[in-house]
Swiss-Prot record:
Binding site for (6S)-5-formyl-5,6,7,8-tetrahydrofolate: 22, 85, 124, 459
Residues annotated as domain TrmE-type G: 221-380
Purpose: Exhibits a very high intrinsic GTPase hydrolysis rate. Involved in the addition of a carboxymethylaminomethyl (cmnm) group at the wobble position (U34) of certain tRNAs, forming tRNA-cmnm(5)s(2)U34.
Residues annotated to bind Mg(2+): 235, 256
Gene name, Swiss-Prot/TrEMBL: mnmE
InterPro entries the UniProt entry points to: G_TrmE, GTP-bd, GTP-bd_TrmE_N, GTPase_MnmE, MnmE_dom2, MnmE_helical, P-loop_NTPase, Small_GTP-bd
Protein's UniProt name: tRNA modification GTPase MnmE
Cofactor binding note from Swiss-Prot or TrEMBL: Binds 1 potassium ion per subunit.
Compartments in which it is found: Cytoplasm
Cellular component, GO, one term: cytosol
EC number: 3.6.-.-
Length: 459
C-alpha cells in the first residue's frame, strides 16, 4: 500500500527522561537523514539499530538536540513500513522542535491511531488485534493486560478464522448441490454435512460468548461501589483493599466529599473500586455534589458493598439505603467489629434476607480475606478461569458474535425445514461476513476509521 510518511510524538507530553518522535512511511529514513548528524542513515546504518548523534536544523545549522535514532526498515516493523524513532530528552520545547522539523522536511502529522491503522492496512495485524493494542495500553490490572496480550497474539483471530473457513467449506458443498440438483444423494449428503458443521460452529460461538461476561470484567474492571452512612468505615475499606491511603480517614462524618476511584486486583478479579460520599440529606453545597455523584455511581455499579457500623444500632437511614441497593448484586458488611457491638445481627439478617453478609474490622484488618473470597465467588462461581484461555472482552465483538449465532441458527432451522439450499446459503454467507467484521476482513471503511480515531496520538 502506497502511503505518505507520518510523524508524531509517541510519548506522553510533559517533562521526562525521554521523549520519542516516531516516523513511518517510505520517506521516514530519508527525512531523518536530512536532520541527523552522525552516520549516514540511508546508506551506512543497518536495520534494527540504535545510533547516537544530533538533530540539526538544516537551514540554520543549529544543533537542536542530542539524540539516539532507531532505524527499523520494512517489512519487519510494526507498520510494515520504514520506521524511525528519534529518542530525545523529555522536555516539551525540544521534542516539539524535532517534530516540527520532521514535518518541515516532508512528513505529515499522524492522525490518532494511524500507526496502528497502518499495521492493520498493511496486514501486520487484524482489527481485533488492533483493538487489543488500545486495551493493553488502557489496562489497569495485570489480568486485564494479560487478556489484551492474548488477543494481540492472535488467539481470538485464529478461532474466528477457523470458523470462517468451516463456513466456506459448507458453502462449497452447497454450491455442488446447487450445480447438480439432479442427484438426490448429493442433496442429502449436503444437508447432513451442513447441519453437522453449522452446529459445531454455533457451539464454538456459544463457547466464546460464555466468556463474554468475565472477559468484559477483565477488560473494564468490575465497577464496585462502597456505600453506607457517613463514617461507617467506607474509606478505610477502600484503603485496605488497595493497600494505600487514598481516602481521608477521620472520625468526622462526611469527610469524603467526592467519589474516589481506584483499580485493584482482588483474588484475580479486577475491581474498579468507588468510594462514595455518604448518601444523606445535607445543606453543605460541596457535600451535596458528592452525594449526587454517589447516586450516579450506584446506578452504574456491577457490585455494591453495603457497609454498616457494628457500634451503632440499625437506623431508618440504613433501611432506606438498603432499599435503594437491594435489587443489585450486593454484599453487606458489618464493619468495626473491634468496637462494642450495638447492632443486632439478627435484625440485619432479617433486613437483607439471603444477601451475603461479612463481618470485618478494617482497623485490625480482620474479615478482609473473607470479603475478597465472597467477591470472587459472587461473580466467578469460585476459582477464576485460567487467564491463558481466550476471552471475548470487547462489546463490539460480543455483539457481532450474538448476530453470528442468530444467523447460523437461521441456517440450521432453514436446512432442517427443507428450505432450498440457495436460501440457506444466504444465512451462511451472512454469518461468514459478520465473523469477518470482528477481524476486519469485511468491516466498512467508516467502522475502521471510527475505531482508530479512539486511539491516542503516536500509536
Amino acid at each position: 500500500m502506497d502511503l505518505d510518511t507520518i510523524t508524531s510524538i509517541s510519548t506522553p507530553m510533559g517533562e521526562g527522561a525521554i521523549g520519542i518522535v516516531r516516523l513511518s512511511g517510505p520517506q521516514a529514513v530519508e527525512i531523518a537523514d536530512k536532520l541527523y548528524k552522525g552516520k549516514h542513515l540511508l546508506n551506512d546504518v543497518p536495520s534494527h539499530t540504535i545510533n547516537y548523534g544530533h538533530i540539526i536544523d538544516p537551514e540554520s545549522k543549529e544543533v537542536v538536540e542530542e539524540v539516539m535514532v532507531s532505524v527499523l526498515r520494512a517489512p519487519k516493523t510494526f507498520t510494515r513500513e520504514d520506521i524511525i524513532e528519534i529518542n530525545c530528552h523529555g522536555g516539551i520545547l525540544t521534542i516539539n522542535r524535532v517534530l516540527e522539523l520532521t514535518m518541515t522536511y516532508g512528513a505529515r502529522m499522524a492522525e490518532p491511531g494511524e500507526f496502528t491503522k497502518r499495521a492493520f492496512l498493511n496486514g501486520r495485524i487484524d482489527l481485533s488485534q488492533a483493538e487489543a493494542v488500545m486495551d493493553f495500553i488502557r489496562s489497569k490490572t495485570d489480568r486485564a493486560s494479560k487478556v489484551a496480550m492474548n488477543q494481540i497474539e492472535g488467539r481470538l483471530s485464529d478461532l474466528i478464522k477457523k470458523q470462517r473457513q468451516s463456513i466456506l467449506e459448507i458453502l462449497a458443498q452447497v454450491e455442488v448441490n446447487i450445480d447438480y440438483p439432479e442427484y438426490d444423494d448429493v442433496e442429502d449428503a449436503t444437508t447432513e454435512f451442513l447441519l453437522e458443521q453449522s452446529k459445531e460452529i454455533k457451539q464454538e460461538i456459544n463457547r466464546l460468548l460464555d466468556t463474554g461476561a468475565q472477559g468484559k470484567i477483565m477488560r473494564e474492571g468490575l465497577s464496585t461501589v462502597i456505600v453506607g452512612k457517613p463514617n461507617v468505615g467506607k474509606s478505610s475499606m477502600l484503603n485496605n483493599l488497595i493497600q494505600d491511603n487514598k481516602a481521608i480517614v477521620t472520625e468526622v462524618a462526611g469527610t469524603t466529599r467526592d467519589v474516589l476511584e481506584e483499580y485493584v486486583n482482588v483474588r484475580s478479579v479486577p475491581l474498579r473500586l468507588v468510594d462514595t460520599a455518604g448518601i444523606r440529606e445535607t445543606e453543605d453545597i460541596v457535600e451535596k455534589i458528592g452525594v449526587e455523584r454517589s447516586r450516579k455511581a450506584l446506578s452504574q455499579a456491577d457490585l455494591i458493598l453495603f457497609v454498616l457500623n457494628n457500634n451503632e444500632a440499625l437506623t431508618q437511614e440504613d433501611y432506606t439505603l438498603y432499599e435503594v441497593v437491594k435489587n443489585e448484586d450486593v454484599i453487606v458488611i458489618v464493619n468495626k467489629m473491634d468496637l462494642e457491638q450495638n447492632i443486632d445481627i439478627n435484625e440485619v439478617k432479617d433486613m437483607i434476607g439471603d444477601t451475603p453478609l461479612i463481618q470485618t474490622s478494617m482497623l485490625k484488618q480482620e474479615g478482609i480475606d473473607e470479603l475478597e473470597i465472597q467477591i470472587r465467588d459472587l461473580f466467578f462461581g469460585g476459582e477464576v478461569q485460567n487467564q491463558d484461555m481466550t476471552y471475548v472482552s470487547n462489546s463490539r465483538h460480543i455483539s457481532l458474535l450474538k448476530q453470528a449465532r442468530q444467523t447460523i441458527q437461521d441456517a440450521i432451522d432453514a436446512a432442517e425445514s427443507g428450505v432450498p439450499m440457495d436460501m440457506v446459503q444466504i444465512d451462511l454467507t451472512r454469518t461468514w461476513e459478520i465473523l469477518g467484521e470482528i477481524i476486519g476482513e469485511t468491516a466498512s471503511d467508516e467502522l475502521i476509521d471510527q475505531l482508530f480515531s479512539q486511539f491516542c496520538l503516536g500509536k
